[in-house]
Amino acid sequence: SDSWNALECIEHLTLYGDFYLPEIEKSLKKATPYPAAGTFKSGWLGNYFAKSLLPKEKLNKMKTFRDKDPNGLPLDKSVLSRFLQQQKQTLDLLNRARTVNMTQVRVPTTIARWIRINLGDIFRVVIYHNQRHILQAQRVIAHLQKQEA
């Protein structure tokens, strides 16, 4: 089918996490410590990407990259453990990012490795994308519960 089930929504997020979390890690390792990091400033491209992923009342469907499409993959509850582990890793990376200038540190995107946006925007992209698909998974579950009632 065209729509994902709840586990597929979460697996989709782990597939993105598999790309972004190591890239954020690499960028943080290369970054110069910056004690007075100041206020993060969004870039125009990063801001565009992040805002396009924000959950909206009427969700705008987006085409996903084939390698990030979980449709038809054999999935079980280990997907949830992997996702939770990635969430802990994201919190750790966010904490470590306090010591660098998130406006200057650049991270490659899944669109193309040469398209790099700043670290602060990458965090926004990852977090908004997670919110979007967690809400999608919740809607799928709510729909199933209505059908069973």
Regions found by a protein language model. Give the residues of each.
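Short, contiguous alpha-helical
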Residues: 1-49, 53, 88, 95-96, ...
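Acidic/histidine-rich alpha-helical segments that form the ligand environment
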Residues: 46-102
